[in-house]
Regions:
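Inter-helical turn/loop segments and adjacent helix faces that build the functional surface
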Residues: 153, 252-259, 291-295, 351, ...
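Acidic/polar, glycine-enriched structural segments that form the non-catalytic walls/loops
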Residues: 20-40, 44-333
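Alpha-helical scaffold segments in carbohydrate-active enzymes
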Residues: 306-313, 363-370, 437-449, 486, ...
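Substrate-binding groove/exosite segments of carbohydrate-active enzymes
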Residues: 39-40, 47-48, 275-423
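Secretory-pathway/luminal and periplasmic proteins that interact with or process carbohydrate-rich
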Residues: 165, 313-319, 369-374, 446-453, ...
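The feature captures the catalytic groove of carbohydrate-active enzymes
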Residues: 329-337, 383-433, 441-498
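Bacterial Sec-dependent N-terminal signal peptides
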Residues: 1-20
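Beta-strand segments within the central parallel beta-sheet cores of soluble alpha/beta enzyme folds
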Residues: 126-127, 156-157, 359-363, 376-377, ...
Length: 498
């Protein structure tokens, strides 16, 4: 990875000024010419905002890779957009050009993204969405309409098969019970090479009792797009709320992704808005129980919250997945895991939320065998971790980049993350079962990697790409040698403890 500017910090929306609220970032000049988007995530699902009302730009699902695009290596998938809505008032569809007072706000404490705008003199509309923290594969959009006059609204929930996908199939399923009616909009497709089956399902969720909710209709546009819709008359001053709940899975996550996405959507619908929100907010309150507080500098406090928010949004307890430099904010760096995860991101999470950091080092442990095979291929002993890692644990760096072949300091970075996890948690069972196997295998790698002087007095590590990636095929890079020494010392200390 050629490092220019690592974006774990927020690339936000336009040229508007950042506010001083420690928890909220608001833009009031939403423009399309320099719009980057902001992500809400739950550590598994990342949803990137759009400058268009009731829409999102991208959906990224952690652990979903296929070999397509640049480099002949695995890439993150740009998945199904389950929160793809639109709304019309009195027959006129709302868009970016016919609304006023358009603002967008990221609430970092609540992990919600909210757009507010006014349509003519007819209604004020608020649209919020969130990646539900309690449900790793589910998201929810909440739309509130406050009429300024008697109006008729028509809302649409659309699913479109991404262009890179193939063999799309569309389904509509009605689940009717005495106490509930759920109209499921579902799409299934194959990833670009057919490696994965990718599915999404969504449904409207209404506040009315069963039998009193609006009638939902299903329409197919073409072989790649279908939708559900409803209409409802509203009186002046009668605030009305409806939701879109969506789920997405791939065959990398579940053996039967289509049925399971529908089950998860049904589960979320029958949990209901209030229970979904209470649980989501409670879990984010728990995350924010570990915070960094700065007195006297509101902008610095907002900046710190912005950084921590993205770390919490991109890593999930129990997932056994690590984090790409761009997290779940898009397809940058192909979604691959680099040394950034172990060296720069892991220490912060280890101090703030060790249970999140544990997922990152478990990701490495689960791919230890692949690292051993990588070392074997290169004529070394032990374990040699890949410079770019995805789902398999084998090297995913494009061939033209020498980093994948020679930037070996990554192995020491992984080892030090394992050792530091033990040092902070003092979990000796984990050290024995998972930490020490990493430390020993990586130490064995360095023992086979070093070369001794002719007189036997000095060891060298020759022919590496340095931590400065422009320094290619150099000898005795300071960082590489230093982390190798630390790795060997940590392995010895761990062995003595056990």
């Amino acid at each position: 990875m050629r490092k220019t500017n690592l974006l774990i910090g927020l690339l936000f929306l336009s040229t508007s000024l950042w506010g001083q609220d420690p928890w909220k970032i608001t833009v009031s000049d939403v423009r399309t010419d320099n719009y980057y988007g902001v992500t809400v995530g739950n550590g598994m699902l990342g949803i990137v905002s759009s400058p268009e009302p009731l829409r999102t730009n991208n959906v990224v699902l952690a652990g979903s890779y296929d070999k397509y695009g640049r480099g002949r290596v695995s890439n993150f998938l740009n998945g199904f957009n389950m929160l793809n809505g639109s709304i019309s008032i009195d027959g006129n569809r709302i868009n970016r050009n016919n609304i006023s007072g358009f603002t967008q706000t990221l609430d970092m404490k609540k992990a919600t993204f909210t757009s507010r705008f006014t349509y003519a003199d007819k209604a004020d509309i608020t649209c919020s969405y969130l990646a539900l923290r309690q449900l790793p594969y589910c998201a929810m959009m909440v739309v509130e309409v406050e009429p300024k006059a008697d109006i008729t609204i028509a809302a649409v929930n659309t699913q479109e098969t991404p262009d890179a996908f193939r063999d799309g199939r569309m389904f509509y399923n009605e689940i009717n019970r005495r106490h509930a009616a759920i109209k499921l909009l579902t799409t299934q497709a194959q990833s670009p090479t057919g490696r994965l089956t990718v599915c999404a399902s969504s449904a409207f969720m209404f506040p009315e009792k069963a039998g009193e909710e609006p009638r939902v209709t299903h329409t197919t546009h073409n072989s790649n797009s279908h939708q559900t819709s409803f209409s409802r008359k509203l009186r002046k001053g009668e605030t009305y709320r409806f939701c879109i709940v969506g789920s997405t899975l791939t065959s990398a996550h579940h053996p039967d992704p289509m049925n399971e996405t529908e089950r998860l959507t049904v589960f979320a619908c029958l949990e209901g808005y209030d229970r979904l929100m209470v649980r989501h907010l409670s879990l984010w309150d728990d995350l924010w129980s570990s915070d960094i507080i700065i007195d006297g500098d509101a902008q610095a406090q907002q900046d710190i919250h912005n950084m921590i928010y993205h770390l919490y949004s991109f890593v999930r307890e129990g997932s056994e997945l690590s984090i790409s430099p761009m997290g779940l904010s898009g397809l940058g760096y192909n979604g691959h895991v680099f040394w950034d995860a172990d060296t720069w991101i892991f220490p912060a999470l280890l101090m703030l939320k060790p249970q999140l950091a544990k997922s990152m080092i478990e990701y490495r442990y689960n791919r230890l065998q692949a690292a051993k095979e990588n070392a074997f291929e290169h004529g070394f002993s032990g374990a040699m971790f890949p410079w770019e890692s995805a789902d398999s644990g084998f090297e995913e760096t494009p061939v033209w980049a020498l980093t994948g072949t020679f930037e070996h300091h990554i192995t020491g970075c992984v080892a030090m993350a394992a050792w530091n996890y033990y040092r902070v948690t003092q979990d000796k069972t984990w050290l024995r079962e998972k930490g020490y196997p990493i430390l020993k295998a990586t130490a064995d790698f360095w023992l086979s990697r070093v070369e001794k002087d002719a007189d036997g007095s000095t060891y060298h590590i020759r022919n590496v790409v340095a931590a400065d990636e422009w320094a290619e095929n150099v000898d005795d890079n300071a960082f590489t040698n230093g982390v190798a020494k630390q790795n060997l010392a940590a392995a010895s200390q761990a062995a003595a403890l056990l």
